[in-house]
Amino acid sequence: IDTAGKERVLHSFGNGTDGSEPFGGLVALGGRMYGTTFRGGATNGGIVFSVDTAGKERVVYNFGLGSPVVPDGRNPESTLTVLNGTLFGTTYNGGVRSAGTVFNLNTAGDESVLYNFGGPGDGAHPYAGLLALKSTLYGTTSAGGAHGEGALFSISARKERVLYSFRGGSDGARPDGGLIALDGSLYGTTYKGGAHDRGTAFSASTQGKERVLESFGSSTAGGADPFAGFYVLNGTLYGTTTQGGSHRQGVAFAMTRAGKERVLYTFGSDSAGAAPFAALTDWNGMLYGVTAAGGATNHGTVFQISP
């Protein structure tokens, strides 16, 4: 899609073996784009695929083909991360404990499980992808942890460490979105928890010291229930919430690193869409995003907004 809104379909999923339900975004590597689907493929456990700009798709890896002794991951939901020419990602299900995995994969389709979630006090079922900082990967899980409300973790050289376990109270619960790094700190959101149980924005050190920046749901105009993580532009955090706002259909917002929030746009009042679940991105100084509903056919929109 170009900035004027002209769209071209590159590939239509749905024949089964090529994957279905692509929840995550795309990353570029070696002249092709790589992504994941939650279902479909050889075992209906999802795939990693590549596609070129002409729309030629190739299945790179089928999840769910591991042996009973060393089971593979299943159902990847997130965008992949590229580190040193290798693809890294998470699966929501599968693995030794059926609680999800961290994996890496080369473009030839050789996959390796780096970590299996679900041990005592460990995170479980990651929705989000991974953040690469030098040789360490950081991420979140939507469940598990010491209190069962999700966890913040790091993984390096196949060794995982839980940095923070969410308690489900004022500190937040269900960190479904991904992390971003800014000036040495990690920033993210939780879908629930906080002072009003409508989600939080938080920062954390790479050692796991967490601080709540904002508890969503404090006013009618403000957003609530953020599913996506942040996008950084010129030192400011930008995000979306799936609900809240004066029309209760979500908002796009800006936030300082100190937690001061400013609503940029309230969804639900016109054809711009409703319920933005995904993170924002930018092009030439403008922010772009998608909504899951609303628009002329009520099937969602691609929108542009000024920061």
Q: Model regions: which residues?
A:
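Extracellular beta-propeller repeat domains
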Residues: 1-307
